[in-house]
A protein has these predicted regions:
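A short, charged, amphipathic alpha-helix used as a generic interaction element across diverse proteins
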Residues: 18-42
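Intrinsic-disorder/low-complexity regions
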Residues: 9-11, 22, 29, 45, ...
């Protein structure tokens, strides 16, 4: 199973959100509101980082 993360670039923030992609979007949105940008991603077995999407703070 894939483990999804919400990350904020240029910080140490890397939140594990488990195995359900749907659970990641609310956390991603909240972190984007606080830090300006956040991204939902996962890591392949070879270590490659795969981005599923992101939010920007445009409010």
């Amino acid at each position: 199973m894939i483990e999804y993360f919400v990350e904020v670039p240029n910080t140490n923030i890397k939140e594990s959100v488990g195995h359900r992609l749907g659970d990641a979007w609310g956390i991603c949105y909240d972190l984007a509101q606080e830090f300006g940008f956040a991204e939902v991603c996962w890591y392949a077995l070879n270590g490659k980082r795969v981005s599923e999407g992101s939010y920007y703070d445009k409010d």
